[in-house]
Amino acid sequence: MCAAAPRGGGRAARRLGAATAGSRVPSAAPRYSRRTRRVPIAYEAEPKPESPGPKWEPENWQQQLERIREMRRHRDAPVDEMGVDKCYDTSAPPQVMRYQVLLSLMLSSQTKDQVTSAAMLRLRQRGLTVDSILQMDDATLGQIIYPVGFWRNKVKYIKQTTAILKQKYGGDIPGTVEELVKLPGVGPKMAHLAMNIAWNSVSGIAVDTHVHRITNRLKWVKKETRYPEETRVALEDWLPRDLWREINWLLVGFGQQTCLPVNPRCKECLNQDICPTAKRF
Protein backbone atom coordinates (compact mmCIF):
# COMPACT_ATOMS: atom_id res chain seq x y z
CA MET A 1 0.00 0.00 0.00
CA CYS A 2 2.14 2.80 -1.27
CA ALA A 3 1.86 6.53 -0.98
CA ALA A 4 3.50 9.63 -2.35
CA ALA A 5 5.96 11.78 -0.41
CA PRO A 6 4.34 15.05 0.67
CA ARG A 7 6.38 17.52 -1.36
CA GLY A 8 6.10 16.20 -4.88
CA GLY A 9 9.26 14.11 -5.07
CA GLY A 10 11.71 17.03 -5.64
CA ARG A 11 14.09 16.68 -8.56
CA ALA A 12 12.84 13.23 -9.56
CA ALA A 13 9.25 14.45 -9.71
CA ARG A 14 10.26 17.37 -11.93
CA ARG A 15 12.09 14.95 -14.23
CA LEU A 16 9.08 12.71 -14.37
CA GLY A 17 6.72 15.52 -15.34
CA ALA A 18 9.12 17.22 -17.73
CA ALA A 19 8.44 15.24 -20.90
CA THR A 20 4.67 15.62 -21.10
CA ALA A 21 4.22 17.24 -24.51
CA GLY A 22 4.57 14.83 -27.39
CA SER A 23 4.65 11.73 -25.20
CA ARG A 24 0.91 11.17 -24.98
CA VAL A 25 -1.50 9.97 -27.59
CA PRO A 26 -5.07 11.06 -26.89
CA SER A 27 -6.68 7.82 -28.03
CA ALA A 28 -8.52 6.09 -25.19
CA ALA A 29 -7.66 2.55 -24.19
CA PRO A 30 -10.36 -0.15 -24.33
CA ARG A 31 -12.35 -0.97 -21.22
CA TYR A 32 -11.91 -4.26 -19.41
CA SER A 33 -14.49 -5.83 -17.19
CA ARG A 34 -13.82 -6.12 -13.46
CA ARG A 35 -15.44 -8.31 -10.84
CA THR A 36 -15.30 -5.71 -8.07
CA ARG A 37 -18.27 -3.45 -7.34
CA ARG A 38 -18.13 -0.33 -9.44
CA VAL A 39 -18.43 3.02 -7.72
CA PRO A 40 -18.95 6.08 -9.96
CA ILE A 41 -15.68 7.93 -10.43
CA ALA A 42 -15.53 11.70 -10.63
CA TYR A 43 -12.58 12.86 -12.73
CA GLU A 44 -10.75 16.14 -12.60
CA ALA A 45 -13.47 18.74 -13.07
CA GLU A 46 -13.75 22.49 -13.17
CA PRO A 47 -13.80 23.97 -9.65
CA LYS A 48 -17.30 24.19 -8.25
CA PRO A 49 -18.60 27.69 -7.53
CA GLU A 50 -18.66 28.52 -3.85
CA SER A 51 -22.10 27.94 -2.37
CA PRO A 52 -23.54 30.63 -0.11
CA GLY A 53 -23.38 30.09 3.63
CA PRO A 54 -20.75 28.44 5.85
CA LYS A 55 -18.98 25.39 4.46
CA TRP A 56 -19.11 22.19 6.50
CA GLU A 57 -15.89 21.06 8.08
CA PRO A 58 -15.15 18.51 10.80
CA GLU A 59 -14.75 19.55 14.40
CA ASN A 60 -11.14 19.89 15.58
CA TRP A 61 -9.75 18.76 12.22
CA GLN A 62 -6.91 21.30 12.13
CA GLN A 63 -5.75 20.35 15.61
CA GLN A 64 -6.01 16.65 14.73
CA LEU A 65 -3.99 17.24 11.56
CA GLU A 66 -1.21 19.06 13.41
CA ARG A 67 -0.98 16.26 15.95
CA ILE A 68 -0.76 13.65 13.18
CA ARG A 69 2.04 15.68 11.60
CA GLU A 70 3.83 15.61 14.94
CA MET A 71 3.43 11.82 15.19
CA ARG A 72 4.74 11.44 11.62
CA ARG A 73 7.70 13.80 11.95
CA HIS A 74 10.29 10.99 12.16
CA ARG A 75 9.21 9.61 8.75
CA ASP A 76 9.98 6.05 9.80
CA ALA A 77 6.87 4.19 8.61
CA PRO A 78 7.15 1.53 5.86
CA VAL A 79 5.67 3.99 3.35
CA ASP A 80 8.51 6.43 4.04
CA GLU A 81 11.22 3.89 3.29
CA MET A 82 9.59 1.63 0.69
CA GLY A 83 6.67 3.59 -0.78
CA VAL A 84 6.03 3.91 -4.51
CA ASP A 85 8.13 7.08 -4.73
CA LYS A 86 11.10 4.95 -3.62
CA CYS A 87 10.48 2.06 -6.04
CA TYR A 88 11.47 3.49 -9.42
CA ASP A 89 14.90 4.08 -10.95
CA THR A 90 15.60 7.81 -10.66
CA SER A 91 18.42 7.55 -13.21
CA ALA A 92 16.16 6.15 -15.95
CA PRO A 93 14.64 8.33 -18.70
CA PRO A 94 11.42 10.11 -17.57
CA GLN A 95 9.17 7.89 -19.70
CA VAL A 96 10.70 4.75 -18.17
CA MET A 97 10.40 6.18 -14.66
CA ARG A 98 6.71 6.92 -15.21
CA TYR A 99 6.15 3.35 -16.38
CA GLN A 100 7.94 2.01 -13.31
CA VAL A 101 5.78 4.21 -11.06
CA LEU A 102 2.63 2.79 -12.64
CA LEU A 103 3.84 -0.81 -12.29
CA SER A 104 4.77 -0.31 -8.65
CA LEU A 105 1.28 1.05 -8.00
CA MET A 106 -0.30 -1.96 -9.70
CA LEU A 107 1.82 -4.31 -7.60
CA SER A 108 1.06 -2.42 -4.36
CA SER A 109 -2.65 -3.26 -4.24
CA GLN A 110 -3.41 -5.59 -1.30
CA THR A 111 0.34 -5.86 -0.70
CA LYS A 112 2.66 -4.57 2.02
CA ASP A 113 5.19 -1.94 1.01
CA GLN A 114 8.09 -4.27 1.86
CA VAL A 115 6.83 -6.91 -0.58
CA THR A 116 6.13 -4.38 -3.34
CA SER A 117 9.57 -2.82 -2.95
CA ALA A 118 11.30 -6.21 -3.17
CA ALA A 119 9.33 -7.20 -6.27
CA MET A 120 10.17 -3.90 -7.98
CA LEU A 121 13.85 -4.35 -7.18
CA ARG A 122 13.84 -7.80 -8.80
CA LEU A 123 12.10 -6.38 -11.88
CA ARG A 124 14.53 -3.47 -12.14
CA GLN A 125 17.50 -5.83 -11.93
CA ARG A 126 16.30 -7.25 -15.24
CA GLY A 127 15.91 -3.81 -16.82
CA LEU A 128 12.30 -2.78 -16.24
CA THR A 129 10.88 -1.19 -19.39
CA VAL A 130 7.78 -1.55 -21.54
CA ASP A 131 9.69 -3.67 -24.04
CA SER A 132 11.29 -5.94 -21.42
CA ILE A 133 7.89 -6.77 -19.92
CA LEU A 134 6.35 -7.45 -23.33
CA GLN A 135 9.20 -9.82 -24.15
CA MET A 136 8.94 -11.65 -20.81
CA ASP A 137 6.74 -14.76 -20.61
CA ASP A 138 3.96 -14.88 -18.02
CA ALA A 139 5.58 -17.63 -15.94
CA THR A 140 8.80 -15.65 -15.52
CA LEU A 141 6.93 -12.47 -14.63
CA GLY A 142 4.91 -14.39 -12.05
CA GLN A 143 8.04 -15.82 -10.46
CA ILE A 144 9.58 -12.36 -10.20
CA ILE A 145 6.63 -10.55 -8.62
CA TYR A 146 5.55 -13.38 -6.27
CA PRO A 147 4.44 -13.08 -3.43
CA VAL A 148 2.58 -9.80 -4.10
CA GLY A 149 -1.14 -10.09 -3.45
CA PHE A 150 -3.19 -11.60 -6.30
CA TRP A 151 0.01 -12.04 -8.30
CA ARG A 152 -1.61 -14.19 -10.99
CA ASN A 153 -4.15 -11.48 -11.79
CA LYS A 154 -1.43 -8.86 -11.73
CA VAL A 155 0.63 -10.77 -14.30
CA LYS A 156 -2.36 -10.58 -16.63
CA TYR A 157 -3.10 -6.91 -15.91
CA ILE A 158 0.54 -5.87 -16.25
CA LYS A 159 0.84 -7.58 -19.63
CA GLN A 160 -2.45 -6.11 -20.90
CA THR A 161 -1.71 -2.61 -19.64
CA THR A 162 1.85 -2.66 -20.98
CA ALA A 163 0.61 -3.68 -24.43
CA ILE A 164 -1.88 -0.79 -24.39
CA LEU A 165 0.84 1.67 -23.37
CA LYS A 166 3.01 0.48 -26.25
CA GLN A 167 0.21 0.62 -28.82
CA LYS A 168 -1.72 3.71 -27.72
CA TYR A 169 0.71 5.91 -25.81
CA GLY A 170 4.09 5.28 -27.43
CA GLY A 171 5.35 3.46 -24.34
CA ASP A 172 4.44 6.26 -21.94
CA ILE A 173 1.59 6.33 -19.43
CA PRO A 174 -1.59 8.41 -19.83
CA GLY A 175 -1.59 11.89 -18.37
CA THR A 176 -5.14 12.02 -17.00
CA VAL A 177 -7.06 10.12 -14.34
CA GLU A 178 -9.82 9.36 -16.84
CA GLU A 179 -7.38 7.57 -19.16
CA LEU A 180 -5.44 5.87 -16.38
CA VAL A 181 -8.47 4.16 -14.81
CA LYS A 182 -9.31 2.59 -18.18
CA LEU A 183 -6.13 0.52 -17.97
CA PRO A 184 -6.54 -3.06 -16.66
CA GLY A 185 -5.69 -3.29 -12.97
CA VAL A 186 -5.60 0.48 -12.37
CA GLY A 187 -8.12 2.00 -9.96
CA PRO A 188 -8.80 5.60 -8.83
CA LYS A 189 -6.29 5.55 -5.95
CA MET A 190 -3.52 4.34 -8.26
CA ALA A 191 -4.50 6.89 -10.91
CA HIS A 192 -4.33 9.85 -8.52
CA LEU A 193 -1.00 8.65 -7.10
CA ALA A 194 0.34 8.16 -10.64
CA MET A 195 -0.65 11.73 -11.49
CA ASN A 196 1.06 12.94 -8.32
CA ILE A 197 4.30 10.97 -8.56
CA ALA A 198 4.72 10.38 -12.30
CA TRP A 199 3.36 13.69 -13.62
CA ASN A 200 3.88 15.87 -10.51
CA SER A 201 0.23 16.92 -10.74
CA VAL A 202 -2.38 16.94 -7.98
CA SER A 203 -5.57 15.61 -9.59
CA GLY A 204 -7.32 14.45 -6.42
CA ILE A 205 -6.86 12.76 -3.05
CA ALA A 206 -5.52 9.21 -3.23
CA VAL A 207 -7.66 7.21 -0.80
CA ASP A 208 -6.43 3.77 0.19
CA THR A 209 -7.58 1.55 3.05
CA HIS A 210 -5.67 3.62 5.63
CA VAL A 211 -7.04 6.98 4.49
CA HIS A 212 -10.54 5.52 4.24
CA ARG A 213 -10.39 4.01 7.74
CA ILE A 214 -8.81 6.97 9.53
CA THR A 215 -10.97 9.69 8.01
CA ASN A 216 -14.07 7.75 9.03
CA ARG A 217 -12.74 7.28 12.56
CA LEU A 218 -11.96 10.99 12.85
CA LYS A 219 -15.37 11.88 11.35
CA TRP A 220 -13.72 13.82 8.56
CA VAL A 221 -16.67 12.82 6.37
CA LYS A 222 -20.18 14.17 6.89
CA LYS A 223 -21.60 10.68 7.08
CA GLU A 224 -19.90 7.30 7.19
CA THR A 225 -18.62 6.12 3.82
CA ARG A 226 -18.37 2.50 2.72
CA TYR A 227 -15.97 2.75 -0.21
CA PRO A 228 -12.68 4.64 -0.76
CA GLU A 229 -14.05 6.49 -3.78
CA GLU A 230 -16.94 7.82 -1.68
CA THR A 231 -14.41 8.93 0.90
CA ARG A 232 -12.36 10.75 -1.73
CA VAL A 233 -15.36 12.73 -2.95
CA ALA A 234 -16.39 13.56 0.63
CA LEU A 235 -12.88 14.74 1.57
CA GLU A 236 -12.39 16.83 -1.55
CA ASP A 237 -15.64 18.64 -0.77
CA TRP A 238 -14.10 20.43 2.23
CA LEU A 239 -10.36 19.71 2.63
CA PRO A 240 -8.24 22.60 1.26
CA ARG A 241 -6.63 21.62 -2.03
CA ASP A 242 -3.14 22.50 -0.84
CA LEU A 243 -3.40 19.55 1.58
CA TRP A 244 -4.46 16.94 -0.99
CA ARG A 245 -0.94 15.77 -1.79
CA GLU A 246 0.21 15.59 1.83
CA ILE A 247 -2.85 13.91 3.33
CA ASN A 248 -2.27 10.52 1.70
CA TRP A 249 1.33 10.30 2.85
CA LEU A 250 0.45 11.46 6.39
CA LEU A 251 -2.47 9.09 6.94
CA VAL A 252 -0.92 6.02 5.31
CA GLY A 253 2.07 6.16 7.64
CA PHE A 254 -0.16 7.02 10.61
CA GLY A 255 -2.31 4.00 9.76
CA GLN A 256 0.72 1.73 9.49
CA GLN A 257 2.12 2.75 12.88
CA THR A 258 -0.64 4.02 15.17
CA CYS A 259 -4.23 3.95 13.89
CA LEU A 260 -4.09 0.25 13.02
CA PRO A 261 -7.06 -1.60 11.46
CA VAL A 262 -7.30 -3.91 14.49
CA ASN A 263 -6.30 -2.89 18.02
CA PRO A 264 -5.31 0.70 17.20
CA ARG A 265 -2.74 2.17 19.57
CA CYS A 266 -5.04 4.85 20.98
CA LYS A 267 -3.04 5.21 24.20
CA GLU A 268 -0.03 6.28 22.13
CA CYS A 269 -2.04 8.64 19.92
CA LEU A 270 -1.82 12.39 20.54
CA ASN A 271 -5.42 12.70 19.36
CA GLN A 272 -6.91 10.36 21.95
CA ASP A 273 -8.69 13.23 23.75
CA ILE A 274 -10.27 14.66 20.58
CA CYS A 275 -10.81 11.52 18.49
CA PRO A 276 -14.55 10.75 18.20
CA THR A 277 -13.98 6.98 18.18
CA ALA A 278 -11.06 6.55 20.61
CA LYS A 279 -13.34 5.34 23.41
CA ARG A 280 -14.53 2.40 21.30
CA PHE A 281 -11.13 0.77 21.55
From Swiss-Prot:
Job of this protein: Bifunctional DNA N-glycosylase with associated apurinic/apyrimidinic (AP) lyase function that catalyzes the first step in base excision repair (BER), the primary repair pathway for the repair of oxidative DNA damage. The DNA N-glycosylase activity releases the damaged DNA base from DNA by cleaving the N-glycosidic bond, leaving an AP site. The AP lyase activity cleaves the phosphodiester bond 3' to the AP site by a beta-elimination. Primarily recognizes and repairs oxidative base damage of pyrimidines.
Protein source organism: Gallus gallus (Chicken)
Family: Belongs to the Nth/MutY family.
One Pfam family in the UniProt entry: HhH-GPD
Domain HhH: residue ranges: 168-192
EC number: 3.2.2.-, 4.2.99.18
Annotated compartments: Nucleus; Mitochondrion
Cofactor detail note: Binds 1 [4Fe-4S] cluster. The cluster does not appear to play a role in catalysis, but is probably involved in the proper positioning of the enzyme along the DNA strand.
Coiled-coil regions listed in the entry: none
A cellular-component GO term for this protein: nucleus
Active site: 189 (nucleophile)
Recorded name of the encoding gene: NTHL1
Organelle targeting sequence: 1-17
Protein name as catalogued: Endonuclease III-like protein 1
Cofactor(s) essential for the protein: [4Fe-4S] cluster
Site-annotated residues for Important for catalytic activity: 208
Compositional bias of kind Low complexity: 15-24
This protein's UniProt keywords: 4Fe-4S, DNA damage, DNA repair, Glycosidase, Hydrolase, Iron, Iron-sulfur, Lyase, Metal-binding, Mitochondrion, Nucleus, Transit peptide
Keyword Acyltransferase: no
Residues noted as binding [4Fe-4S] cluster in the record, renumbered to the chain: 259, 266, 269, 275
Catalysed reactions listed for this entry: 2'-deoxyribonucleotide-(2'-deoxyribose 5'-phosphate)-2'-deoxyribonucleotide-DNA = a 3'-end 2'-deoxyribonucleotide-(2,3-dehydro-2,3-deoxyribose 5'-phosphate)-DNA + a 5'-end 5'-phospho-2'-deoxyribonucleoside-DNA + H(+)
GO molecular function: 4 iron, 4 sulfur cluster binding; class I DNA-(apurinic or apyrimidinic site) endonuclease activity; DNA binding; DNA-(apurinic or apyrimidinic site) endonuclease activity; metal ion binding; oxidized pyrimidine nucleobase lesion DNA N-glycosylase activity
Region (Disordered) residue spans: 1-60
Top-rank taxon, per record: Eukaryota
GO biological process: base-excision repair, AP site formation; nucleotide-excision repair
